[in-house]
Regions:
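Periplasmic polypeptide-binding modules associated with outer-membrane biogenesis and secretion
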Residues: 1-87, 117-130, 292-295
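Transmembrane beta-barrel strands of outer-membrane/channel proteins
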Residues: 55, 81-85, 112-118, 147-153, ...
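Repeated loop/turn-to-beta-strand initiation elements of outer-membrane beta-barrel proteins
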Residues: 76-78, 106-112, 141-147, 188-193, ...
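Hydrophobic, lipid-facing positions within transmembrane beta-strands of outer-membrane proteins
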Residues: 94-98, 130-134, 175-179, 221-225, ...
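Outer-membrane beta-barrel "beta-signal"
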Residues: 100, 380-388, 405-418
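Transmembrane beta-barrel wall of Gram-negative outer-membrane proteins
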Residues: 111-113, 124-219, 223-227
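C-terminal outer-membrane beta-barrel translocator/porin domains of Gram-negative envelope proteins
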Residues: 205-362
Length: 418
């Protein structure tokens, strides 16, 4: 006789209506994979990471009641303050930020995340950057929906030319609106496949002095579809993904321009693939962790520069300060990191990364002298109580002669939780 769900109820500390968490409801078949999905849905909320399910005999023969047991201290609002030097010299190297996450604001086990980031040189009117965003998501069994809006602005001053022209301020602004659906069509005790469907709008504007630069004007509606699979192993995990994104010219008010393509119709398409591996192992009594990630991008036709793959910096090829990068419509990034524990909950790590760009845009700027970067980095990260840190020193190992970067790149990131 198949088991069925009796009732679903909370054991105190309820933060919302639990129905959206569960793929099946009262009187539906009891399935372990459904319970795994529901538990993942609730634990994605920061304040519910310790939530557990109790399974109790139901009132009818074959029924099982599900009791949602929440943490004793489940704060619904979390704040994370950040400070780092991940910016650019041209728009503000040092950055300050805050992230506010609200659990179940609509009592649907949904989540609202609001972020704000700014350069630390608030009194400097010649350079600066700000970023802000708001995103909301909600689970619906094996699916989830999300919407978001973000804005990024920057200002810098272009140097005066040799002919005597005055320095001019350059201001840029990007806004993005997004709606997404994610579905889990396949799940086992050790693996999960996720499909994603995203519709977005991107609006770019820039001004040089008081003049709007029409060459940089874009208002593009686009799509992004993809599939990702995660497989848990005894001592690690494997992740693989494939995606396609592109534009919808019929809905785009201003598709922008592509160099050397005066008759471009605004349609572009890109393919991406990602493969990542996490592995834990021992050498004698010491534990190590390895993480490797390979990301590939290919554009079969013309694409705007906003879609180019950029390499050279802490989030792509480490060892470079990020002030100058290589960019191209096609390319790949391979990141490798080996870490081991040190003094308590902290760890030290070493990284070796490489990347290459090709296709449109790759031979412009520093790319005229080469299209490949190789860099390395060593660092330490960890935390104490509510404070976290990540400090690393990196250096370029191989680069084009025309790409200017510091001989040693210092990457610092600090966080504080409230």
């Amino acid at each position: 006789m198949p088991g069925r769900i009796g009732t679903i109820r909370d054991a105190g500390g309820r933060i919302g209506w639990p129905a959206p968490l569960f793929p099946r409801h009262a009187h539906g078949l009891l399935n372990v994979r459904d319970l795994d999905q529901a538990l993942e849905n609730v634990r994605r909320l920061p304040g519910q990471a310790a939530t557990a399910f109790d399974l109790l005999p139901g009132a009818a023969l074959g029924d099982t009641d599900i009791v949602v047991r929440h943490p004793a201290d489940a704060r619904r609002v979390r704040v994370l303050a950040t400070a780092d030097n991940a910016g650019l010299d041209a728009t503000g190297r040092n950055q300050l930020g805050a992230i506010v996450a609200v659990d179940s604001p609509l009592h649907l086990y949904d989540q609202l995340v609001v972020t704000y980031n700014t350069d630390a040189a608030r009194g400097n009117k010649t350079v600066g950057s700000q970023a802000k965003s708001a995103a909301w998501n909600m689970p619906i069994g094996y699916a989830s929906v999300s919407v978001g809006i973000s804005e990024w602005t920057s200002r810098q001053t272009l140097p005066a030319t040799a002919g005597g022209a005055a320095a001019l301020p350059l201001a840029q602004r990007t806004r993005r609106y997004e709606a997404a659906l994610r579905v889990v069509p396949y799940r086992t005790s050790h693996g999960k496949t996720t499909l994603r469907f995203t519709l977005s709008r991107r609006d770019d504007r820039s001004r040089l002095g008081s003049t709007e630069l029409d060459v940089n004007r874009r208002d593009i509606v686009g799509y992004d579809v993809g599939i990702a699979h995660r497989e848990k192993l005894a001592d690690g995990a494997l992740d693989a993904g494939f995606g396609m994104r592109g534009s919808i010219p019929a809905l785009s008010a201003h598709p922008g321009r592509v160099n050397d393509r005066p008759a471009w119709d605004g349609r572009y398409r890109l393919f991406t693939a990602t493969l990542a591996a996490d592995a834990r192992f021992r050498v004698g009594a010491r534990r190590f962790g390895y993480r490797g990630t390979l990301r590939v991008q290919h554009a079969p036709g013309a694409a705007p520069s906003t879609e180019f793959l950029q390499i050279g910096g802490r989030y792509t090829v480490r060892g470079f300060d990020g002030n100058q990068t290589l960019a191209g419509a096609n390319g790949w990034i391979w990141r490798n990191e080996l870490a081991t524990g040190a003094f308590g909950a902290n760890e030290i790590y070493a990284a070796l990364d490489a990347g290459r760009v090709s296709g449109a845009g790759a031979a412009e700027g520093p790319g005229r002298g080469g299209r490949t970067l190789v860099g390395t980095s060593v660092g330490v990260r960890g935390g104490y109580r509510l404070v976290g840190y990540d400090v690393a020193l990196g250096a370029p190992l191989y680069k084009p002669a025309l790409l200017n970067t510091a001989a040693v790149a210092l990457d610092v990131s600090l966080t504080a939780r409230f």
